[in-house]
Regions:
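Noncatalytic scaffold domains of N-terminal-nucleophile
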Residues: 3-7, 11-181, 186-188, 193-239, ...
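Active-site rim segments in enzyme catalytic domains, especially the processed small/beta chain
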Residues: 24-28, 35-52, 67, 205-207, ...
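A short acidic/small-residue loop/turn micro-motif
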Residues: 56, 351-353, 413-414
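Feature for intrinsically disordered/low-complexity regulatory segments and propeptides
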Residues: 171, 421-424
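Short, small/polar residue-rich loop motifs at catalytic or cofactor-binding pockets
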Residues: 218, 328-331, 392-394
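Extended C-terminal regions of large enzymes
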Residues: 234-237, 399-416
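Internal maturation/activation junctions in enzymes
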Residues: 253-350, 363, 370
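Compact, glycine/acidic-enriched structural inserts
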Residues: 308-311, 428-442
């Protein structure tokens, strides 16, 4: 990303370049088969912009049809064709680039194309996760066709070892096509045809029209004021970002700094705030196109009501609250700031492990398995439905102080991400830690 900045690229250009490289070098956490969320601070307008780059389910498959495919299963699997949703990352790249980019997309992707052709050393932690992925997929080879993944990452029957030079010429060709032909090559052109043909062969209900219809959504980040002028900003559902804001609105009602960090008292309030917020996550967070989000979840009044339920002496059993519908918004995270002050907070993931194990013919990447998070209960806000985005765990964040940009924030960890965001914020605001200390202690 530093080379991209030195060449005159913006923070968004550098973020795209870095994300592409991570998809090659850390395929166990992210890649162009997954989804992307981002928050951008634009120094020209002095505003935050949010992007929801998550994909949808097949338009022609109903919940009843899905349940018929699942048989006696009570939830969606993590592997195979059924948990696949449209990959949103590539479209999100172009949305970000069209608004904030300076270099061409081909220039942004060129370093990763080169690394994919010439090879790169495999990091120890990636070697470990690749080995785990091989074991997980091998156990399920009677359930779905794992052969394309074997060709890309496990050609000799084993996972690459730490220090091995790994090459992925198929991914190089795919990225080169995207850079040369643009977004439509992936969602409407030959790449889309390859993906849909492969998915249908595996038993998926996706069509060419589903891919052509995909689009990212620009959204307004919402912010909650903590104390001392600090604001935490997150993206709205179908992500879980609002859970962090709910925790902030609960915790602002108690002075955590009166106790030492990590003390039983402080940890009790942190834990109870998380539990209260997560009850609402399970009840209210879903694709707002299907289930409107009660914006009252973010009101200070609602935060006070939830805080009042906490017993300072013991853990308490909670249920979801009753917010008003109208109010009084495995993973790799990266952040880039350029010389003009543009700041990018970007998170991207294939969801569980490398994804669902399916690799389209000759394209060098794996489809995500995010659809595992759909509920099969038709009454649930996150119930599976045609053309619906599933609940998302990945959330970028942004922190302002006295209205000015202060820092970007994000981390891996699935469902604990809102909790992690709040822990970092509390460590900085209440316990005076610097950024490194706050992250290490969280």
């Amino acid at each position: 990303e530093t080379d991209t900045l030195k060449a005159g690229g913006s923070a968004v250009d550098a973020a795209i370049a870095a994300n592409a490289a991570l998809g090659l070098m850390e395929p166990t956490g992210n890649g162009i088969g997954g989804d992307l969320f981002a928050i951008v601070w634009d120094p020209k307008t002095q505003k935050l912009y949010g992007l929801n780059g998550s994909g949808r389910s097949p338009s022609g498959q109903t919940l009843a049809q899905l349940r018929e495919k699942l048989g006696d299963a009570t939830s969606l699997p993590a592997y195979g064709p059924l948990p696949v949703t449209i990959p949103g990352t590539v479209d999100a790249w172009f949305e970000l680039h069209d608004r904030f980019g300076k270099r061409t997309m081909a220039e942004n992707l060129a370093p990763t194309v080169r690394y994919a052709r010439e090879g790169h050393p495999v990091a120890p932690v990636i070697a470990m996760y690749l080995d785990r992925s091989l074991a997980a997929y091998s156990r399920r080879e009677d359930e779905f066709d794992f052969s394309n993944a074997r060709k890309v990452w496990f050609a000799d029957g084993s996972a690459p070892e730490a220090g091995d030079i790994f090459r992925n010429p198929d991914l190089a060709n795919t990225l080169e096509t995207i850079g040369r032909e643009g977004r439509d090559a992936f969602y409407e052109g030959a790449l889309a045809e390859t993906m849909v043909t492969y998915l249908q062969r595996q038993g998926s209900a996706f069509t060419r029209a589903d891919f052509a219809a995909h689009d990212s959504e620009w959204v307004d980040p919402a912010c909650a004021t903590y104390r001392d002028g600090f604001e935490l900003c997150e993206l709205p559902p179908n992500s879980q970002g609002f859970a962090a804001l709910q925790m902030v609105n609960i915790l602002k009602n108690v002075d955590l700094a009166q106790w030492e960090r990590g003390s039983p008292e402080a940890m009790h309030y942190m834990t109870e705030a998380k539990r209260l917020a997560y009850e609402d996550v399970a009840r209210f967070y879903a694709d707002p196109d299907f289930s409107p989000t009660p914006m009252d979840l973010l009101s200070e009044r609602y935060g006070r009501e939830r805080f009042a339920l906490i017993d300072p002496a013991k853990a308490t059993a909670y249920g979801p609250g009753e917010p008003k519908l109208e109010g009084e918004g495995d993973t790799t995270y990266l952040t880039v700031v350029d010389g003009e002050g543009m700041m990018v907070s970007l998170i991207q993931s294939n969801y569980r492990g490398m994804g669902g194990g399916l690799v389209p013919d000759g394209l060098g990447f794996m489809f995500q398995d995010r659809g595992e998070l759909y509920s099969l209960d038709p009454a649930h806000p996150n119930a599976y439905a045609p053309s619906k985005r599933p609940f998302q765990t990945i959330i970028p964040a942004f922190v302002k102080k006295d209205g000015a940009p202060y820092m970007t924030l994000g981390l891996m960890g699935g469902g604990m991400q809102p909790q992690g965001h709040v822990q970092v914020l509390v460590n900085i605001v209440d316990y005076g830690m610097n950024l490194q200390e706050a992250g290490d202690a969280a």
